């Protein structure tokens, strides 16, 4: 976990102290149910809570024990015994290490996802506000990076808003899939621990019961979870790349905030670089990098091997922390994005009306020209404009094929910018429901 990207509230989820507290709660809740079932003395279960609740576990001591025993859960339980005393012998009855580790990881991932969903809500709020602000701000739409037809900047942002709505839905679904509890023993048969114990722990920890566990919770759940985070990362990158392109000097339709005192380059004092969105592009790569190892974790040997553990110790904190940072940074960029409507109009007019070529084509076909003939006439004049020979409207008015079919008034109407925005309200109603 890179501290540069970890805000304190999020980092706490992945601190060893938090994990040990969760592990203790799992063990203690299991002991409660075992006491109720008569497996262990009720007084022992009470003592476990009395001596263990709210305790600060010694991470150094647990690490010291683990260096000797080479087993993380045994090291933890040994330290708990040092704190709780003889009653600690009733902990972990019939349980296996993965019962504790997997369930604890599920709690951590669920908590992390709750914060990620809050982050997405920040992005959605910023996108909605700016989309409404620029609902009818004209700009050029581009395909293959080349001018296509007019759109509005609000429509661009509305598309990203809809994408982040889907991102939110995926995170909600991913949380539900990952938030499962397994307390089923060495190979998942409940031979030495009752299913009622699992159900009790699941309820207390806010989890669902894993229907069929082996020694572990099946890793397809984790693969799906990290895939959902990866798609969220790609949604971030798509918007970040859009902003980076719009900030190019020769485009300059929108720009990241640039604060007083900020420096863009150690060598060139004039630079205003899109460093925030470039950073988001890089973080998206890191977030997506978790998917392949998460998928490879699915095919564990038989009832379980440990090959997944080292992977998850890295990708669980790293990926969630990176996504949290990226979402919050993106929300800030959108909230403070500098928009240049005048530059958008200038760029829209840069090709001298070529963005209206489809309307001219359609009008000619509706006047009776064959599509091939109409296309050839419009394209011939458009290519002259591309070569810098003159104005599109003037060429069309002088064209022997176009002129007999379209009057000056009709041609002027075909170049009306507002025509392209007649469905903006419909799209906004679909997206925002307003």
Regions found by a protein language model. Name each.
Residues 1-190, 194-200, 209, 262-265, ...:
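A helix-coil-helix interface module used to build multimeric assemblies
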Residues 30-33, 116, 120-123, 127-130, ...:
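Amphipathic alpha-helices that form helix-helix packing interfaces
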């Amino acid at each position: 976990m890179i501290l540069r990207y970890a805000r304190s509230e999020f980092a706490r989820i992945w601190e060893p102290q938090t994990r040990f507290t969760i592990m203790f709660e799992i063990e203690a809740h299991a002991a409660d149910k075992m006491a109720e079932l008569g497996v262990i003395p009720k007084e022992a279960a009470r003592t476990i809570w009395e001596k263990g609740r709210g305790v600060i576990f010694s991470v150094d001591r647990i690490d010291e024990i683990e260096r000797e025993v080479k087993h993380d859960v045994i090291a933890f339980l040994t330290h708990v015994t040092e704190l709780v005393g003889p009653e600690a012998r009733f902990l972990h009855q019939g349980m296996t290490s993965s019962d504790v580790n997997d369930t604890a990881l599920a709690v951590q991932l669920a908590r992390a996802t709750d914060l990620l969903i809050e982050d997405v809500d920040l992005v959605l709020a910023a996108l909605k506000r700016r989309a409404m602000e620029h609902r009818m701000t004209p700009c050029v739409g581009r395909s293959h990076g080349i001018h296509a037809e007019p759109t509005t900047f609000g429509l661009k942002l509305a598309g990203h808003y809809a994408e982040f709505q889907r991102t939110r839905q995926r995170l909600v679904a991913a949380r539900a899939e990952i938030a499962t509890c397994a307390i089923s023993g060495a190979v998942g048969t409940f031979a030495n621990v009752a299913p009622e114990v699992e159900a009790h722990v699941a309820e207390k920890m806010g989890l669902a019961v894993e229907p069929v566990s082996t020694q572990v919770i099946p890793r397809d759940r984790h693969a799906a979870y990290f895939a959902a985070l990866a798609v969220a990362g790609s949604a971030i990158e798509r918007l970040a790349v859009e902003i980076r392109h719009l900030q190019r000097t020769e485009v300059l339709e929108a720009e990241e905030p640039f604060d007083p005192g900020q420096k863009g380059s150690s060598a060139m004092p004039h630079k205003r670089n899109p460093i925030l969105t470039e950073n988001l592009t890089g973080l998206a790569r890191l977030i997506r990098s978790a998917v392949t190892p998460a998928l490879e974790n699915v095919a564990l040997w038989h009832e379980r091997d440990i090959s997944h553990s080292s992977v998850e110790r890295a990708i669980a904190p790293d990926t969630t922390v990176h996504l949290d940072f990226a979402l919050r940074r993106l929300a800030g960029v959108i909230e403070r994005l500098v928009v240049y409507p005048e530059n958008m109009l200038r760029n829209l007019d840069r090709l001298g009306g070529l963005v209206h070529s489809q309307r001219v084509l359609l009008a000619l076909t509706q006047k009776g020209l064959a599509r091939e003939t109409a296309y050839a006439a419009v394209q011939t004049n458009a290519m002259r404009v591309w070569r810098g020979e003159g104005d599109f409207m003037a060429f069309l008015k002088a064209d022997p094929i176009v002129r007999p079919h379209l009057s000056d008034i009709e041609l002027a109407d075909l170049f009306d910018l507002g025509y392209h925005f007649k469905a903006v309200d419909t799209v906004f109603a679909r997206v925002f429901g307003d």
